[in-house]
Amino acid sequence: MYYFASDIHLGAGGEAFAQQTERRFVRWLDDAAQDAEAIFLVGDVFDFWFEYRGVVPKGFVRTLGKLAELTDRGIRVVFFTGNHDMWVGDYLARECGVEIYTSPQQFRLNGKNVFIAHGDNMNIDGQPVLKFLNTVFRSRTLRWLFSWLLHPDLAMRFGHWWSGKSRKSHGAEAVSYTHLRAHETPEHLV
C-alpha cells in the first residue's frame, strides 16, 4: 500500500497546537506503517525547516524518531520538499534514512507511472511575483547568505514569521489542483 501526506506544517501555531499536530501525524504514520510499502511526504511537512551544516531545527523529535524507525523497518519514506521546507539538506536522509526529492518525480507504483509533486512551483509562468519569489528562495546564493549571516535563532524566528505570513495569505483550507490539460493528464491522477 502507498500512503501520501502533505502540508502538515509541523511547528505552525502555538506550542500546544504544534505538539498536537505532531502527535496526530505520528499516529497517522503508525497507522500507515501497518501495511505500507512506501510513505510519500509531498512537501510542507515542516512549517519551516532550514539546515545549517551542524544545526537542524529544534523540536520534531517524535516525527524524526518515527521516520527513522519506519526506514529501519524497511518501509520506504519519500520526502518531497515544498515551499515551507525547501531548505532541507541531507540530515533527514543521513539520520532518518528518508529519500529526499527537491523537484517533481515520476514513480512506478502498482504498475502505473505516477507523477508526484508538491506543486508550489508548478504553473507559475503567468505569475511574475510568485516566479520571482520561487527563484529567490531557491537560490544557492540566498541559502549561503542565510546560513552564514544569520544566527540560527534569528533565522528560525524570521523563517517562522515568513512561513506564517505565506501560509495565511491564501485563505484556503484545501487545495484542488486541476489545471492539467487533457493531453497532459496521465491516466491516473493522485
What are these regions (language model features)?
Residues 83, 104, 113, 118-121, ...:
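Short, flexible active-site-adjacent loop segments at beta-strand->alpha-helix junctions, enriched
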Residues 86-90, 116-117, 123-126:
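Short, well-ordered, mixed-charge alpha-helical segments that flank or form enzyme active sites
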Residues 119-177:
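Active-site-proximal loop/helix segment associated with metal-binding centers of metalloenzymes
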